[in-house]
Amino acid sequence: MPEGEGGDCGEVPALVPDGEPLREEQRPLKQSLGGSLCRESHWKCLLLTLLIHACGAVVAWCRLATVPRLVLGPEAALARGAGGPPPTYPASPCSDGYLYIPLAFVSLLYLLYLAECWHCHVRSCQAPRTDANTVLALIHRLQQAPPCVWWKATSYHYVRRTRQITRYRNGDAYTTTQVYHERADSRTARGEFDYSAHGVRDVSKELVGLADHAATRLRFTKCFSFGSAEAEASYLTQRARFFSANEGLDDYLEAREGMHLKDVDFRESLMVFADPRSPPWYARAWVFWLVSAATLSWPLRVVAAYGTAHVHYQVEKLFGASSPPPGAVPSGPPLSRVATVDFTELEWHICSNRQLVPSYSEAVVMGASSGAYLRGCQRCRRSVSSNSLPPARPSGPRLPFSRSRLSLGAGGRTTPGVFRSLSGGPLGRRGEDTEPLESPPCYEDALYFPVLIVHGDSGCRGDGQGAL
C-alpha cells in the first residue's frame, strides 16, 4: 500500500467518466421565523439586551417618578398639633446616591453587549463572501477532484522529566523539584486507500437555485461510501493491515484518519449573495454597528437569519463504481484475517496453527452467487475450536481494530444469511446440497469460539496455494 502525507498522496487513477444518470437536485431552503430562532437563538445578545433595558427602565423610573415625603421640622409639629394631615413634598425615589447603582450596571452591561456584538461580527466575517457563479464552479471542481482516504499512525511514549520551580509560602521563596511526564513521538507512518482496482465516482447532488435568494449560507462536508462489497472489504483490509503493521512499536499508538480532495481548496462554509457588491441591507457592516449601538442587535440578527437561506452540500465519493480492468492485479486477497483479528495473541495462534478465522464480512457480503470463490479442497475440514484462543483479552490501552460496518441485526439477533469461508473447500457445496443455510452467530461467540477451516500440512491443492 503506498504511503504518503494526508495532503500528498501520490498518483491515483482518474475518476470514472461522466456516464452516470442525471444527478439529484438540491435547492437552498429558507427557514420560517420559528425555525430561524431555533437555529440561531443568540441568547447571550438577547439576555444582555433585556438586562440593559431593565436597568434603563429603573434609571428612568428614578428620574421621572415622584413619591411623597414627610416634611420634618417645626412645621410638621404644628400641623400634627392642629390635627391636620402631615405636610409632604414630592421627591425622587432614588435620592441620596441610589441613582448611581443602576447607572453602573447599565455601563457594565453595555460594554459586555458591545463585546458580544464584536464577536458575532467576527464570526460572520470568517465565512468568505462570493457569488453564485463562483460557487457553482467550485462545486464542479469538487465533483471532479479525486479523493484521498488517508491514515496516520503515531507511536509514542512518555518520558519522566524533572524541573526546578520556585514556590512562595508566607512571603518566603523556596525552590523545589517538580516531576512531570512529557510525550515523545518515536515513529510516524502514513498511508492511503488504494482503490485502483475498484474505481471511484462522484455521486454528489446538483445544487440549483442559488440565484433565487438574496443571501445563502452554504456549508460543505465530504464523505465516501462503497458501491460494492469487494470495495468495502478491500478498504477494511488495507486499513486494518496498516494499523496492525504499526501496532506494538511503542507504548502507545495514536491513530488518525480522514479524507481530502486533491487540488481543491476545500472550505467548510461560504456566504453566497446574488450580487456581492450590493448585499442586502441587513448584511452590511455599517447597518449592523448602527443598530447595535442602539441595543437592537438581536432583532437585526433575527431578521438576517429569517432572510438567509441555508443549504448543506455534501461531496460524496463512491468507491467500487466500476468493475476492475481485465489486466488489473488485486492489491491483496478479497478478505484478510486482519479484518477480524482483535489482539496480537490471536494473530500469533492463527499463524502457528495454520488456521483462518472466518470474517464477519464474509458472512454477509457473500451471496448464493459467489460460489466462484469456493474452490474444491478435499483436505479441508470444518471444526469448532477454542483451545487456540487466549482465555481473556489483554488489559491496558490498545488501538481498536477496524470492524466491518455491515449490519448483522439489532439487539444481538442474527439475520438469515450464508456463513461461508473464502478459504475454499466443499463446505459451501455441502451446505447447498444437504443442509439448510445457517445464520452467523453473534459477535462474541464468533470471536471466542470461531469456526475454523483447518488445512493439512501440504496445504490446499484445490486452489493451488500453500497453507496459510
From Swiss-Prot:
Cell location: Endoplasmic reticulum membrane; Cell projection, Axon; Cell projection, Dendrite
Mutant phenotype after disruption: Knockout mice exhibited frequent spontaneous dyskinesia attacks.
Similarity comment text for this entry: Belongs to the TMEM151 family.
Organism, as annotated: Mus musculus (Mouse)
InterPro entries on file: Tmem151
A Gene Ontology cellular-component term: endoplasmic reticulum membrane
Major subcellular location class: endoplasmic reticulum
The organism's place on the tree of life at top rank: Eukaryota
Coiled coil: none
Tissue specificity statement from the Swiss-Prot or TrEMBL entry: Highly expressed in the central nervous system (CNS) including the cerebral cortex, hippocampus, spinal cord, brainstem, and thalamus. Expression is relatively low during postnatal stages but highly expressed at postnatal day 14 (P14), and declined in adulthood. Also expressed in the stomach, heart, liver, spleen, lung, kidney, and muscle.
Membrane-traversing stretches: 45-65, 98-118
Membrane topology, record value: Multi-pass membrane protein
Region (Disordered): 1-20, 384-438
Name of the protein in question: Transmembrane protein 151A
PANTHER family linked to this entry: TRANSMEMBRANE PROTEIN 151 HOMOLOG, TRANSMEMBRANE PROTEIN 151A
Keyword vocabulary terms for this entry: Cell projection, Endoplasmic reticulum, Membrane, Transmembrane, Transmembrane helix
Cysteine disulfide partners in this protein: none
